[in-house]
Amino acid sequence: MTVKERITALRARMKETGIDAYLIPTDDFHGSEYVGEYFKCRKYITGFTGSAGTAVIMQDMAGLWTDGRYFIQAADQLEGTGITLFKMGEPEVPTVHEFLKKNLTQGRCLGFDGRTVSAKEAAELEKMLDENGVSLSVDHDLAGDIWENRPALSCEPVTELDIKWAGESRADKCARIRKAMEKKGADLFVLTSLDDIAWLLNIRGGDIHCCPVVLSYLVMTKTEIRLFANEKAFQPDVLEALEKDGVTLFPYDSIYEYVKTFKKDKKVLLCKKKVNSRLVSNIPADTRILDEENLTLLPKATKNPVEVENERIAHIRDGVAVTKFIYWLKKNVGRIPITELSAAEKLYEFRSEQENFIDNSFDPIIAYGKHAAIVHYFATPETDIPLEPSGFLLADTGGHYKEGTTDITRTIVTGPTSEEEKKYFTAVLRGTLNLGAARFLHGCTGVNLDILARQPLWEMGEDFKHGTGHGVGYLLNVHEGPNSFRWKTVPGGNAVLEEGMITSDEPGYYREDGFGIRHENLMVCKKAEKTEYGQFMCFEFLTMVPFDLDGVVPELMSVRERNLLNDYHAQVYEKISPYLNEEEKEWLKDATRAI
């Protein structure tokens, strides 16, 4: 079926079930940013493939809301579908909730699958729409009803993460969380975020593409841990090890019945921003719910010394692969046929040669020329274009290694570029260097520091429509909270930067139909000196790959900025050159020369 045919079929099901507007978020049953094929209902209905977006279907309109990363991509993919694009955050553009409040009147009904909407959002919708006399219907997966040949739920094999990689045993992690439960006065802890469960139990899977997680729910009490997952994914030795640490396996969907048995005298801790609304609504009304952040959130984000040291190793391995790729690319572009897709395959080949490489940490963004202006562009056979010996290639890629997860962006000069392009290339690089060199008092958040990355562009009256940085998991999700860099404050999204947190530093500049630039390093937060003013903090770059000096205008940089770049490049040469052949090493020596 075409997108138009799918929407027509969905509207027919809406009529049958008395639903006037149907909400389709991106989420799976666990609030994941990236989801497995089974859960891609929004993509199936709208044809939009971006990782963030919400669709609303009514009888007389269809709309898709997405953020600035995807404006260009969404406009292209929605063309001819009859779906209206709502550019989130733009002036005069209503939010999804504002739109629903305005367009749903007395007696109307909003529907959604309650497993794909958080309890927090569902409560907000119910309160807002109740004022209009609008009802909710949350038990129907209407998109699933019309989805022909829907993929099955993933059930990839589960493995254990050895303590030499994790740095802390499963038993010790569970004991830590139980202590936190005790402090909060909680009798039960309901955990549904897939990366949190994988971190807590030191298990990894493959149920989401490029995200080594296991489709599961978890309930911890003072005496037991119930894991709800597909038993077929667990080998006997993994099950035995889990059982030894007090973890008992139950069928994946059975949690919805289990939570109905919670006693009224028990206090249940869960995060309504993360747990889906159907699960929370199944908990008896007289049970007291403590709505708190997941107790695993900060422990997961603050990497322990073993994890940090392993990440340094992972980034050297990754640095070797990406450096070899850049050398190969600059040597061969214009000489042999290279396209965006074939370049991505070549980079994967270089990564695969590295010890302990597992997989990409996300689908590679290899974007040449005007494609680089699409912040999260993914080449397909239909969009793939050849690389030419001119302009920029933006390569935003990453890998999973046993030692950790990487995420790196380099804007590579493939040939002659204009002075204007170099001006912006240099401005963005200055932002990356300045943020990475920050020293700050403990207690600062990413909001406090974000201006260091944006200032060079802001001075030019320019900006970029995405966050400056995100947390990164340890052999887990490449996007992880709560740490981030952004200039706007958001409720509950302004976490203090703690020792051991790994965060990306990735300002950019994008000119539609022109070019795109992004420079990204991962960095770990560390303690610096302690004075009478308090504990100072700093960052250490983990990523070890040269920035392309062919795009840099040294005269546009301060002496301090040039020194920062030179010092970084000296580190890159020292750590990466021992793993290169003589030709590559000679090239890297020039690529990291002092300016």
For the regions a protein language model found, what residue spans apply to each?
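Active-site neighborhoods and metal-handling regions in enzymes and metal-associated proteins
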Residues: 1-595
